[in-house]
């Protein structure tokens, strides 16, 4: 609301992307549907990241291609990822044997419904919006999303049977060094792995 007050020759506005990223951590433990590479690929193709940025973040940001922003020397546009392609996601699932045999709009394979348990938390106000947006677009490709938005996320994530996808927000390189992210999220003894 105070922005117009600064619109004059006495002020110069500049901006730079931060390393804050909204990302999905997928559960590779036995029993999770995310052990299926086709499901992981379909999730990546079935979430409208561009729409999330434009509509829910009001254009404040851009879809990430990886863990780090495009301007960094160690990520961003050097990484490729799936783009939003609902029809392509449906094809990936069909080819992997996930079909809607009972006509309810949700795919099944070997008697198992394609449902993902989506864990997130409310303290980053965008995360529940991301969950609802993903729930809508993934339903369009035949994936049912059960959202658990809880402040107790750090306890819930310890139970591998309680989640398939964990949506988080994090500053990925707070010191400008990518090692932080790998130390916290990616190594086998990482605190958030």
What are these regions, as identified by a protein language model?
Residues 1-30, 54, 63, 169:
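Extracellular/periplasmic solute-recognition and catalytic clefts
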Residues 1-5, 144-146, 151:
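Ligand-site clamp/hinge motif
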Residues 1-2, 49, 68, 169-173:
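Beta->alpha turn/N-cap motifs
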Residues 16, 29, 56-59, 68-71, ...:
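Active-site-proximal beta-strand/loop segments in catalytic clefts of secreted hydrolases
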Residues 35-136:
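Append "and occasionally in soluble cytosolic enzymes with long acidic Gly/Pro-rich linkers
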Residues 133-145:
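Short alpha-helix C-terminal cap/hinge motif
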């Amino acid at each position: 609301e105070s922005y117009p007050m600064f619109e004059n020759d006495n002020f110069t506005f500049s901006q730079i992307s931060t390393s804050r990223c909204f990302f999905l951590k997928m559960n590779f433990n036995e029993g999770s549907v995310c052990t299926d590479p086709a499901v992981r690929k379909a999730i990546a193709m079935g979430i409208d990241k561009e729409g999330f940025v434009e509509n829910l973040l009001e254009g404040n940001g851009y879809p990430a291609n990886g863990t780090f922003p495009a301007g960094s020397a160690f990520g961003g546009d050097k990484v490729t990822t799936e783009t939003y392609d609902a029809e392509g996601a449906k094809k990936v699932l069909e080819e992997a044997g996930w079909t809607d045999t009972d006509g309810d709009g949700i795919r099944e394979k070997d008697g198992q419904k394609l449902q993902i348990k989506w864990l997130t938390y409310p303290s980053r106000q965008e995360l529940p919006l991301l969950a609802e947006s993903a729930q809508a677009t993934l339903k369009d490709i035949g994936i049912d999303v059960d959202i658990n938005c809880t402040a107790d996320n750090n306890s819930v994530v310890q139970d591998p049977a309680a989640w398939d996808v964990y949506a988080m927000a994090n500053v990925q390189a707070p010191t400008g060094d990518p090692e932080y992210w790998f130390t916290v999220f990616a190594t086998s003894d990482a605190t958030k792995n």
